[in-house]
Amino acid sequence: MSSSRLIEINPFYSHTLKNERTIYVYLPPSYHSDDRKRYPVLYMQDGQHVFFKDRKGESWDVHLTVDELTAQGRMREIIVVAVSHVEDARIAEYMHANPDGHNIFQTTNQGELYETFLVREVKPFIDETYRTLTEKEHTALMGSSAGGLVSYNIGFRQPETFGMIGALCPFFVSVDPATMEDRWLSAVYTDKKPLKIWMDVGDAEGFTVMEKHVRQVADTLMEAGYKPGGDFMYYFAVGSGHSQKDWAARVHAPLLYFFGEIGTPVRVDLHGPERIGLQGPSCALNPVVHYDSGFMMTDLDADYEVTDPGIVEVTAEGRLLPKREGNVTVRYKRQGLTASLDLTVVPHLSGMVSVTMFVEVPVCTPKTDTLYAGIELPMIGERLYGGTFQVPRGISFEFRISRGLGKHETDASGREIPYRKFTAREGLELSYRVEHWVDVPPDTEAKEAANG
């Protein structure tokens, strides 16, 4: 039996961007055994991580997921085109013009040029080289973080080319943790285009991508006429951070949505706060519907029952509207599925809580003024970093402590460790100890200790 293949195109030169990069192409198992067959195409950003590991040892492993889903008959065979980014040009190429004109990243935004590169250079080359179905209804564009943002922008600007858009954890807003200022990085489109859209976000991404911003864009899509559960799928991923492993864990869902069958709903899990305030931050429920295919999504058009509607009301989108103090049970009910959640309404909940964090580092740590542990930590003493910070109530962080990209913590032997995680539902005091660093030889600690 034939197997899928990965083709490397290197270098691929762009006359528009005046640079070169590697493009990887996944060809399905039947490609070389049936020369009459043509295939839908998925174009993906950050292509070097689509099939291969990043500096953290993580990958989307899209080829493995596509192989599995097609072998199970759950989706059509497709071609996947993974377009690598150029390291020092990634942010510039993935950013279209900012609506407020601010140049947040001190670089010239080249999103429009990158868009031209994809539409007029990459896609024509792929269509000429491989047996593709060229029409928009067979062509998808997908990315995560800044790659999700550029996919969103290109999709709305080029709907005659791309009929399906996957925006995973799209980087719509840069948040200044010190001031909590929101700096929007993109226009938000208010007109409806002939697109199928998948949009998601994890609940443990800290300040990197916050659900309230992604949800704001999702609400705008629904106001424009996109139907949740129809031409728009939204997913608020519980326990999910901002890394390749998180996107790998759920990429099957947009693949099924674009190229397969999502199946039948079999279970719903109702997530939400235990307490909300008559005065305080707005809150919403997150009913995650699971399907027999493995597909999942957040239902933004649900039916709810409340034991006492005089205490709280719930909109179809899951918004909680507190009326007075008290305790209620909220019940989700749709498509034969039910789930319940107990909720208390209190007079007031502050929007911010205090997190005090300290990190002790080993002797072998190279000199650095700051660490990153979900929050940027300054040095406050010898081998000690930390401080007290104000963060939004309920925010979650998933992280490894690091000194920068490719310089994260490991165990004492240099092996990878699990991600750390915390949720700031109330004030917290946290203390961590780093054993070693991935970029420091494992025996450095002993040598430096011996040298005093």
PLM feature spans:
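Non-catalytic cap/lid and distal C-terminal segments of serine-dependent acyl enzymes
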Residues: 1-269, 283-286, 350-369, 381-386, ...
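Intrinsic N-terminal pre-sequences and regulatory tails
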Residues: 216-223, 234-236, 290-292, 316-317, ...
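Short flexible loop/turn segments that cap and initiate beta-strands
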Residues: 35-39, 290-316
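Insoluble glucan recognition modules
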Residues: 272, 278-280, 317, 321-327, ...
